[in-house]
Amino acid sequence: MRWKTILLSIAPLLAAEALTRGQELIDRMVARVENDIILQSEVSALGHYQQFVDGKTESDGKILDRLIDQWIVRNEADTARFPHPSDAEVAHGVGRLQASFASTEEYESRKKQAGLSDLDIRAMVAMQLYLSNYLNSRFRSAVQIAPKEVEDFYQDAVVTRAKARNQAPPALDASREYIQEALVQRGINEQADRWLKESRARLRVAKFLSEGAK
């Protein structure tokens, strides 16, 4: 479900960090969710993170929708007293993020362009892990993958891609575990999408974004 991107609720942390660094922020409320509020600084902070990770940002309206989704997941996880990731898990997540860039130089350059510190990034990764781990825990047991689904994915995706690259595809048995997990993750995303849609319909939400930002 674009979990690179439920881009999980680091925006308030970044907004607070920006204020403590003395940056000039003109803040205003852009949404009310139940008894909580979402600020323009949170939308801006998530946009900076998207710029860092993807090299581009969504519209403020789409970012606000993501923040509302994050609120839903975070509220559920906090209510369930779901455990936060360990320091080792966070460090591993930061390492994986760094490895997703072509080079250390590109990572540092994009980090600087986005105005993020190492502490910002660690906070982002920690919260992203917290929320994605919660969704995994909540929905994994409901996802069942039939053997034929694995075989179909192998033929339609793995074999087709290998042929397009003029490469020999890996054996099905060697790919089975990877394919199984990919299909489980897709199922979790689908379950989470449905749950979020149902949850949003029950929420009291008021948005105050200007028309041009939607």
Tell me the role of every PLM-derived stretch:
Residues L25-I26, E58-K214:
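Peptidyl-prolyl cis-trans isomerase
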Residues S9-A16:
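Bacterial N-terminal signal peptides
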Residues M1-L8:
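Bacterial N-terminal signal peptides that target proteins for export
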Residues Q23-I38:
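Short N-terminal segments immediately surrounding and downstream of signal-peptide cleavage
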Residues L39-Q40, K163:
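Short, solvent-exposed loop/turn elements at domain surfaces
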Residues A18-G22:
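Sec/Tat signal peptide C-region and signal peptidase I cleavage site
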Residues S44-E58:
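Short, surface-exposed, low-complexity cationic segments
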